[in-house]
């Protein structure tokens, strides 16, 4: 729930007041199973020690600030991350800008900053975490926390079949169209939100009207292909056939399109914001010899997608 979000520094001090906190910190892009393990541990420690659980969420990745050439797309925007973290039962969420001041702090200075900012008593981090410009980690970080009279807990990296669950791994899977595996790592369906814009009406001419989606350039769109998905419009869910790519059968196909045919839906939704929850890749983008052959394939795709979503065979 967004009401748990603390927007201003002074508000954080008022809310925390005399309550010491168990704190975890990160960007939490995608809020995947690895993040959820960290959040669960934070909640557990907070309840066990009569503390408040607090998650500090960097609005942007710190490495973007350090390395201006960093350009990896995000899996989720800030609002999505806050909502997902809130669903894990965290008491308070504080969005934080990573800036020059924070960038130039040593690990000791950064811990003192967190202690003062959030009345931190216990820090929970992954075993691979490095803090400060001096990149303190492991035993050195543990010793520093002891000296500052802070508790520190390392959480082991969450793995699936010996593969570490990480945002970068999920990013690569989604780029390559391996959406089902990405969803397993996420612990949820990959979600893309965007605004419906005017298209060229080719879908309508073929008998399968589509909603053309404009998404934030910062958010990752899956690799080219046809996908089974759910479409959420004003809190109502519909089955959808999602197409991403350059539409190789059509002329003037120089622009990558994200468009979804919403099954058994015929309302005007231009200008509305919709959410796509992507379930499974059905096939690659293919160039057909004629529009008739494309039309036949779309019909097959929609039937396959309907059966998959109806039977929930992807679960």
What spans do the regions from the language model cover?
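Glycine-rich, Lys/Arg-enriched anion-binding loops that position phosphate/diphosphate groups
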Residues: 147-243
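N-terminal Rossmann-like or analogous alpha/beta NTP/dinucleotide-binding catalytic cores
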Residues: 64-148
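Generic structural signal for residues in well-ordered beta-strands
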Residues: 2-3, 93, 152, 276
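Residue-level signal for inorganic ion chemistry
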Residues: 32, 85, 123, 182, ...
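Short acidic-hydrophobic, aromatic-tinged amphipathic segments that line or gate anion-handling sites
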Residues: 2-13, 94
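Phosphate/ribose-recognition catalytic cores of enzymes acting on nucleotide-derived substrates
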Residues: 199-315
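Residues at the starts of beta-strands that form the adenosine-phosphate
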Residues: 50-54, 92, 151
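N-terminal catalytic cores of NTP/NDP-binding nucleotidyl/phosphoryl-transfer enzymes
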Residues: 12-77
């Amino acid at each position: 729930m967004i009401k748990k979000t603390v927007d201003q520094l002074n508000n954080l001090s008022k809310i925390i007041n005399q309550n010491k906190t168990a704190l975890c910190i990160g960007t939490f892009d995608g809020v995947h199973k690895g993040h959820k393990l960290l959040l669960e541990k934070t909640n557990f420690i907070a309840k066990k020690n009569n503390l408040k659980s607090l998650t500090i969420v960097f609005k942007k990745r710190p490495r973007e600030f350090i390395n201006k050439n960093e350009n990896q797309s995000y899996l989720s925007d800030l609002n999505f991350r806050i909502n997902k973290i809130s669903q894990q039962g965290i008491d308070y969420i504080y969005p934080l800008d990573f800036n020059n001041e924070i960038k130039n702090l040593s690990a000791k200075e950064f811990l003192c900053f967190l202690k003062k900012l959030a009345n931190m008593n216990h820090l929970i981090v992954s075993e691979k975490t490095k803090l400060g410009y001096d990149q303190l980690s492991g035993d050195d970080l543990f010793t520093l926390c002891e000296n500052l009279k802070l508790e520190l807990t390392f959480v082991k990296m969450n793995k699936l079949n010996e593969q570490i669950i990480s945002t970068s791994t999920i990013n690569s899977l989604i780029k390559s169209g391996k959406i089902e595996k990405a969803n397993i790592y996420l612990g949820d369906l990959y979600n893309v939100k965007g605004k419906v814009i005017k298209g060229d009406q080719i879908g309508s001419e073929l008998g399968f009207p589509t909603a053309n989606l404009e998404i934030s350039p910062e958010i990752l769109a899956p690799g080219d292909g046809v996908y089974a998905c759910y479409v959420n419009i004003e809190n109502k869910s519909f089955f959808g056939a999602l197409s991403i790519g350059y539409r190789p059968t059509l002329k003037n196909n120089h622009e990558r399109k994200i468009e979804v045919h919403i099954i058994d839906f015929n309302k005007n939704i231009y200008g509305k914001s919709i959410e796509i929850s992507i379930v499974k890749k059905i096939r690659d983008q293919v160039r057909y010899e004629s529009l008739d052959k494309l039309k036949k394939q779309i019909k097959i795709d929609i039937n396959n997608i309907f059966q998959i979503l109806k039977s929930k065979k992807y679960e």
